[in-house]
């Protein structure tokens, strides 16, 4: 049977491996056994030797590289098949901690790099659980026990729930306790269940997907906390140079894979707004909207349009999910260019939007993907979704006064499509350069 080490780097066995490991001076040393595991992994692409990690530090970076490439259209799972091989588990535990320490020592807790390391930990759990057959449920039960799910009260998950990584509606509760174990579910509810098998109902309500989500999110939360702890310690303790070197490799890897000079997001480079290319509905919104249409026009239409037009105009063509910080890592553009345009339009409304509805500033922040807060902050990103612009059809229904189509409108279905096409025409004719 595969051990929980392969899934849970926070188990006592995993911590023991870390405690017994020698000096950090050796994390960059070539490990023949690690290379051999990669070579004998079923399905591994062996055509390129650079695909296989030769050291623990290299394996650490490969974990992140796998996650970043996994989101691209050209991803080949055979390039990283060794990461799904349980034989790698002891090296992988060490690599996990090297990666997390490098993220904590080299970057702010709310940085893009730290966030990607946390997300990669959750994604790794999900993919690894999916490779198991009949052992999957047993391993999940063991990992949940290790993570402290037995007798867990939902209030103990406050940080996890507050982060948006887990929803209260995902959980089965009884008297404040989270019911996740099969036997506990049957014992707790069998007297209340009529005309159904308790086992079957458990599979429906607390199925593999719910347990997988809980494991993934709990490990993400602990990874985030560990990175934060390392960050605090790094201000008082000298960081090992190889950890800092790994942090630099993380930076280079993120920049290389998420750069906008190639790959599926080639056309996603942020560019200055070209107001001459705005469609009539957006121009009308910028001029100011009367009471009745103000909220939807500013919060739903303008916020998404301006943010995507400035940061990611090719979203519908690339179809690659992005967050604002992927394109604006320090939020300088968001705070300095995007929000002022939206707020100015809100002030031109009759009456000014925020005078009547100051809470709409919170909704604008939420529509950008930063949750219900006064202003976008990196630490809150992911609490909500970054919404794409409304379609022309929805604008006709919800904001008919703003829909005053011109000739170009007849051939498009979204204001952002209008913007891209008009911008291209302006560039082609030489009327406007970005």
Swiss-Prot record:
Cofactor(s) required for function per UniProt: [4Fe-4S] cluster
Name of the featured protein: DNA primase large subunit PriL
Classification via HAMAP family: DNA_primase_lrg_arc
Family annotation (NCBIfam families): PRK03968.1 (NF003051)
Organism annotation: Methanothermobacter thermautotrophicus (strain ATCC 29096 / DSM 1053 / JCM 10044 / NBRC 100330 / Delta H) (Methanobacterium thermoautotrophicum)
Function: Regulatory subunit of DNA primase, an RNA polymerase that catalyzes the synthesis of short RNA molecules used as primers for DNA polymerase during DNA replication. Stabilizes and modulates the activity of the small subunit, increasing the rate of DNA synthesis, and conferring RNA synthesis capability. The DNA polymerase activity may enable DNA primase to also catalyze primer extension after primer synthesis. May also play a role in DNA repair.
SUPFAM superfamilies in the cross-refs: PriB N-terminal domain-like
Coiled-coil annotated residue ranges, if any: none
Keywords: 4Fe-4S, DNA replication, Iron, Iron-sulfur, Metal-binding, Primosome
Keyword 4Fe-4S appears in the UniProt entry: yes
Domain of life according to the entry: Archaea
BP GO terms, sorted: DNA replication, synthesis of primer
One GO term describing the cellular component: primosome complex
Family stated for the protein in its record: Belongs to the eukaryotic-type primase large subunit family.
